[in-house]
Amino acid sequence: MKILIVDDHPLIREALRHVLAVLDADIALIEAQNFAEGLAAASDNPNLDLILLDLGLPDADGIDALTELRRHYPAVPTVVLSASEHPATVMRAIEAGAMGFIPKTTSSHLLLNALRLVLSGGVYLPTEVLRQHQGTPEPALRLAVEASDGGKMLTPREIGLTARQADVLALLVQGKPNKLICRELDVAEGTVKIHVTAILKALNVTNRTQAVIAVGKLGLQLRQI
């Protein structure tokens, strides 16, 4: 397993080295202390499994850096590390394509669980931040919070999705538009639109960003495509 850490704080990188060592027996960690180094490292290591990106880099706006990484490396899940837990920051990161948002105050145990979820195709979001942002959630999201609190992880089938809709959702949470989804799944774009409509209805949300939030709350482990 190969992970790129982009963070300008040496102590944070050192702490991550110790924590991530137990994630995989054959782990390789590549480190960069600014965004320019991070882009170069990503280019030099084409088989990355995960990118951990600090939003507070000295040489780039955090969301702009995330957007650029997603544009160049859409197949590599990127998880945001941030000193901020503000709901607006979480939302901006998710809208930019992050597959996870982990506050730097997160415990080592929770960090590892979050990364395992992302590596298995899921999305990790801090539940308490989402609760604050959502206020009174829609029924499907309320069910998701309850499932998260109780340790139970719902499957796509349990929320009424077919296997094909689950595949569409897996690509949707990666930030891919309908044209790319239909190409990767070899189906008509009109069919993808029908599936997306069904997915939003099943999650009781109205747009893709809300769908990603719902996936994070449900802890859905979607198939990696």
Predicted regions and their residues:
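Conserved active-site segment of CheY-like receiver
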Residues: D8, L81-E85, K104-T106
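Acidic, metal-coordinating helix/loop segments flanking the phosphotransfer/catalytic sites
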Residues: Q33-L50
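Active-site residues of response regulator receiver
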Residues: D54-L55, S82
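The feature encodes the CheY-like receiver
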Residues: P58
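Short amphipathic alpha-helix used as the core "switch/output" element in two-component signaling
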Residues: I63-A75
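Short, flexible helix-to-coil linker/hinge segments that flank and couple to helix-turn-helix
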Residues: V90-I94, T105-P156
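Recognition helix of helix-turn-helix DNA-binding domains
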Residues: G175-Q210
